[in-house]
Each structure stands twice: as structure tokens, then as C-alpha cells.
Amino acid sequence: MKSPTTYLLPYADISWQPDNTPYANAFEDIYWSNAGGLEEKQYIFLEGCDVQYRWRTLTPNARFTILETGFGFGLNFLLTVRAWQSEPHPQNARLEYIAYEQHLVSPHDLKKMAGLFGLEAELELMLEQYPEPVPGNHTIWIADDICLHLVVGEIHDQIETLEAEVDGIYLDGFTPSQNDAMWNEALLSKLVSCLRPGGKVSTYTVAGALRRALIKYGLTVEKAKGFGRKRDMLIAEKPGDWQPASHNIKKIIVIGAGLTGLLCAKALRRRGHKVSLVDQTSEPLGALRQIKQIAIYPQLSKTPQPYSNLYLRAYQYFLRHQALHACGRIE
């Protein structure tokens, strides 16, 4: 992997066609079918992976995890959020969504998409925390029961450190003939290894190399009726009976109610744990309450380094969740 020379990756280079279909100039491909973008995504991915049917079997403290290759405009994610929020779930059940994207779509293009599909409300939740295009993992809490892990950068560089068990995989990269890196066997092997027994994979393409690779790595593969004018699509399943994953709730004591202690307690509670906060004073923050202003800044280097990239992403995360009056910009 080449060392980066800038902290920010460029946004996706997009041209809007006369019928309001976005076209990725770098990959010479469209982001969705002009026959119906929302219906296409709903049919291929949400229905292909049976997500709503499986959600109805979740138990208290369950975690349902989806992994997507090719986040793009976030249509699959926004539709999944809308579906999740449209029905009740057991106590402390949560949706985890892991998505990879080499080039984020700009906020301007995202807003145009939302206007076309009536997704303004769902997009607003995401845009409030939408990161600058800094490579790496960005954790975005859409709600207490919905967490998006948006991973920016080349997927082969980023996925090496992934440790997750997922219930469904949306394979939604650009067409294999234009984006071979998103469909090669090394990546597919890693993805399949993360899939839980009974977990499903869905995609719009029926390319022979993809079918053979999924079968090679142990999945049962079938062709299904495609969307619109497309004759076929692929659905694959890992052998075994699918069961909801349960999150182990722990009782945790955090000692110290300073800034770090409060943030740790908040993070643990958000993940469903039962937290007790212990401090020698009766008020949170103690002496820090006397401070009228604080300055938060990342430690950066002249050129991006692993540690400075981590600091920058942590800084962005802090700003997203503390409702601070931030100023300045990242360049």
C-alpha cells in the first residue's frame, strides 16, 4: 500500500444523466437502475437477504449485522434504516451496519439523491454526522439502536483488520468488468469467513467467476429472478441454521467522573452495558466544571501517518457526538 500524501481522499467523480441517474466517471457505470433505484435496492438486498423476516425473530439484546461493499449514496443503508425503524424490536436489540467505500459521495450529491427519492428525513440523520473523506473507520450513531461503521478507502487495505460476524452481505460494487478489485477471490474469501451460519449474500450480478468463488468458499448459490429488465440475480447462503446473535450484557464500574470517565460510561451504556460511575465528588466533571472553554485538537503530522490519521478520525467522532460549537476546517 502506498503511503498517502494527503489526509483527505477525493469525493466520487459523478455526472448526473438527463434522467437523474448518477454516473461514476471513474468506473464508467451507474449507481442504480433508471428503472427504479429504491425498488431495485429493496428487492435485491433487503429482500434478497431476508433481513426484515429475520428481524422478527430477534431476541432481547440481539445484534443484527449487515456488511456492504460499495456504500455509494447510502441507498441500501437508508432503506435498511427505514425498514428497521418501521417495526418494533426487542429490548436492546441493535442494527450494526458495516460499509466500505473508496470514494465518498459529496453532501451536495447526497442531497440531490434524497430529493429524488423522498429520503430527506433519513439522510438528515446521516448527514449530521457524515465524515470528511478521511481513510479509515468512522463510527456513526444514527440512533441508540442503529450504528453505521463507514470505512473509507481501498477495501483491500481496510478489510484486513475486520473482525466481525455478519448476518447478511450486500455485494453492491460497480460491475465486475469495470471494478475487478471489488470482486476478486481474496476479498470474497474474507467476506465469507465473516458470515455467520445461515447468513445470506445477495447481489445483482450473476458473473460466472463470482458464482464459482462463492461455491468454492462453501456457500450454497442460487439464481433468483432479477429486478426489472435484468433476468437474474444471485443469492448465496452459508450452511447451518441461522440464529440471532446475542450481546453479552455486563455490569461495569467506571472510576472517575471526569471527561474521560463520563465518555467511557456513555460509550458503554450505549452498547447496552449496565454502568456504575464512581467518583469522590457528588458532581460530574468535578473541577472541570469551573472551566468555561476547552480546546480539542488532533495531533497531526506534515504528511498522514497511522497515528495522525487515528487522531483525526477520533477528533471527528468527538465533534459529532458532543454538540460542540466547532470552527475551522480540514484540508
Regions found by a protein language model. Give the residues of each.
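Rossmann-like AdoMet
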Residues: 1-64, 81-117
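The AdoMet/dcAdoMet-binding core of the Class I SAM-like
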Residues: 58-166, 185
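Glycine-rich FAD pyrophosphate-binding loop
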Residues: 270-290
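Conserved beta-strand signature within the Rossmann-like core of class I S-adenosyl-L-methionine
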Residues: 198-205
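N-terminal Rossmann-like FAD-binding beta1-loop-alpha1 element of flavoenzymes
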Residues: 250-277
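Class I S-adenosyl-L-methionine
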Residues: 207-248
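A short glycine-rich, Lys/Arg-flanked "PGG" loop and its adjoining helix->strand segment in the class I
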Residues: 184-197
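Dinucleotide-binding Rossmann-like beta1-alpha1 core, especially the glycine-rich loop
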Residues: 295-331
